[in-house]
Curated annotation (Swiss-Prot):
Component of ribonuclease P, a ribonucleoprotein complex that generates mature tRNA molecules by cleaving their 5'-ends. Keywords: Acetylation, Metal-binding, Nucleus, tRNA processing, Zinc. RNase P consists of a catalytic RNA moiety and about 10 protein subunits; POP1, POP4, POP5, POP7, RPP14, RPP21, RPP25, RPP30, RPP38 and RPP40. Within the RNase P complex, POP1, POP7 and RPP25 form the 'finger' subcomplex, POP5, RPP14, RPP40 and homodimeric RPP30 form the 'palm' subcomplex, and RPP21, POP4 and RPP38 form the 'wrist' subcomplex. All subunits of the RNase P complex interact with the catalytic RNA. Pfam families: Rpr2. It comes from Macaca mulatta (Rhesus macaque). This is Ribonuclease P protein subunit p21. The modification N-acetylalanine is found at residue 2. Residues 112-154 are annotated as: Disordered. GO terms for molecular function: metal ion binding; ribonuclease P activity. Residues 137-146 have a biased composition (Basic and acidic residues). GO terms for biological process: tRNA processing. Zn(2+) binds at residues 62, 65, 92, 95. The gene is RPP21.
Length: 154
């Protein structure tokens, strides 16, 4: 069970702005400027408060003009092959900026991997404490005294 979320109100505001942009485009596809304003506001709030957004949300926003990327309406999607790998290329129709995403069914995003989950980190073996390399001066003094006394006897 998840604990309390830090900046819960900010995440709710981001969610509202993202949904509002979707609703505006769904009702009137010509009203892209208002949807872009909502997305730009959402992006600036997330940057100002240093909040990490989900990759699926970031992939639906243009990094150049903050437009909401809806295939066939505000962007084009093409499947390309490059060096044996399949890529999905999204091109924004407003600013012509393109983004490439790996189209591999076996690929997992970092957040979806088991080692990225906080619950699994607690299950792994605990970190071993580092050995104390700082020795006190008194640990070395008796050896030095013995060496000095032994050398003066000779």
């Amino acid at each position: 069970m998840a604990g309390p979320v830090k900046d819960r109100e900010a995440f709710q505001r981001l969610n509202f702005l993202y949904q509002a942009a979707h609703c505006v485009l769904a009702q009137d596809p010509e009203n892209q400027a208002l949807a872009r304003f909502y997305c730009h506001t959402e992006r600036t709030i997330a940057k100002r408060l240093v909040l990490r957004r989900d990759p699926s949300v970031k992939r639906t926003l243009c990094r150049g003009c903050s437009s909401l990327l809806v295939p066939g309406l505000t962007c084009t999607q093409r499947q390309r092959r490059c060096r044996g790998q399949r890529w999905t290329v999204q091109t924004c129709l407003t600013c012509q900026r393109s983004q490439r995403f790996l189209n591999d069914p076996g690929h997992l995003l970092w957040g979806d991997r088991p080692e990225a989950q906080l619950g699994n980190q607690a299950d792994s073996k605990p970190l071993q404490p580092l050995p104390n390399t700082a020795h006190s001066i008194s640990d070395h003094l008796p050896e030095e005294k013995m060496q000095i006394q032994g050398s003066s006897d000779q």
